[in-house]
């Protein structure tokens, strides 16, 4: 059986189209979806019906699905979520709301597990360790190669003092996750961990591409093939600049553009900057209101988008 593993589409229908065309060309028979299907790009009402109708599909929800249920406010910090919620078709929202947080099943002699973040399997410290807000600082010489990232990812996992203990009590099988938008996989004995990367919003400091992973399970053998379909984001950026989303959430959408043109994280760094800016001008309103959010972004832009490390 050949599985196409897809995560973090984030409303990017053109990227999903590239992935599905490639998966079909390479004989994908089943589709495993690891969450975060909307918010960031505006085509989620095309993305969701496409995913729902894939053959032999299994899907879980991500962390951003819950943002579609935020009470609408006047702030700019969550404006992109409010806009997406206001435009989400009811049947698409109902499908998202029906998705479980995790799935576990046996198929073709193998146990499968899907959750949105690695922390569901190995603890929250693993989620924190692999957050994308450290990658842009770790790889100032980006774009990096997949081989380098795979090696670094494995070493980082193995370097954790309790990794062997956690692995020892984890049932054998294949563990699929997304969340940090970084394509990787690692096998430790009969434990295989796969992050297909982000289909629609890659942040792994490699070449910008529509990412997914092919997994073949046959006669007890597991074969992983990471797939990246490069494309130019600039035409999509120009198209989105004419969209309702750009008018409703210009700061957030400009952050999306920065991420796409560098294949690295900017959103978290900007939120750190906005917090410092708001404190400096004596604005204690949270979430950030439009005037402060916009002014903070304009200053951050003038300063060359400085990267503010996490605590």
Regions found by a protein language model. Give the residues of each.
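Beta-strand-turn-beta hairpins that frame and shape the catalytic cleft
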Residues: 1-4, 104-113, 188-193, 222-223
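N-terminal active-site segment of His-dependent metallophosphoesterases
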Residues: 1-57
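Active-site neighborhood of phospho(di)ester-bond hydrolases with catalytic His/Asp-centered motifs
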Residues: 6-7, 31-36, 40, 58-63, ...
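Active-site environment of divalent metal-dependent phosphoester hydrolases
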Residues: 10-15, 39-42, 64-69, 120-122, ...
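Active-site neighborhood of divalent metal-dependent phosphoester bond hydrolases
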Residues: 47, 54-105, 109-114, 121, ...
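A contiguous binding-surface segment within folded domains or other stable secondary-structure elements
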Residues: 147-219
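Acidic, His/Gly-rich catalytic cores of divalent-metal-dependent hydrolytic chemistry
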Residues: 187-196, 200-311
């Amino acid at each position: 059986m050949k599985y196409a593993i897809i995560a973090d589409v984030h409303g990017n229908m053109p990227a999903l189209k590239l992935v599905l065309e490639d998966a079909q060309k390479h004989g994908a028979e089943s589709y495993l979806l690891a969450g975060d299907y909307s918010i960031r790009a505006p085509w989620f009402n095309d993305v969701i019906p496409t995913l729902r109708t894939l053959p032999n599909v299994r899907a879980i929800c991500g962390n951003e699905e819950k943002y579609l249920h935020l009470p609408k406010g006047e702030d700019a910090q969550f404006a992109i979520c409010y806009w997406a919620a206001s435009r989400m078709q009811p049947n698409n929202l109902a499908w998202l709301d029906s998705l479980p947080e995790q799935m576990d099943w046996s198929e073709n002699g193998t146990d499968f597990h899907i959750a949105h973040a690695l922390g569901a399997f190995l603890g929250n410290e693993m989620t924190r360790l692999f957050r994308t807000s450290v990658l842009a600082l770790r790889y100032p010489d980006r774009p990096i190669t997949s081989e380098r990232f795979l090696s670094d990812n494995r070493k980082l996992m193995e370097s954790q003092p309790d990794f062997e203990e956690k692995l020892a009590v984890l049932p054998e099988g294949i563990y699929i996750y997304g969340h940090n938008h970084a394509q990787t996989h690692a096998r430790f004995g009969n434990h295989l961990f796969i992050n297909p990367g982000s289909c629609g919003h890659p942040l792994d400091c490699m070449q910008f591409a529509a990412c997914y992973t092919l997994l073949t399970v046959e006669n007890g053998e597991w074969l992983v093939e990471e797939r990246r379909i490069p494309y130019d984001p600039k035409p999509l950026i120009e198209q989105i600049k004419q969209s309702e989303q750009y008018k409703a959430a210009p700061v957030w959408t400009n952050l999306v553009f920065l991420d796409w043109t560098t294949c690295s994280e900017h959103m978290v760094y900007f939120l750190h900057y906005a917090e410092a800016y708001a404190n400096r001008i004596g604005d204690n309103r949270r979430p950030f209101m439009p005037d402060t959010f916009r002014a903070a972004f304009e200053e951050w832009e003038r300063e060359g988008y400085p990267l503010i490390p996490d605590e």
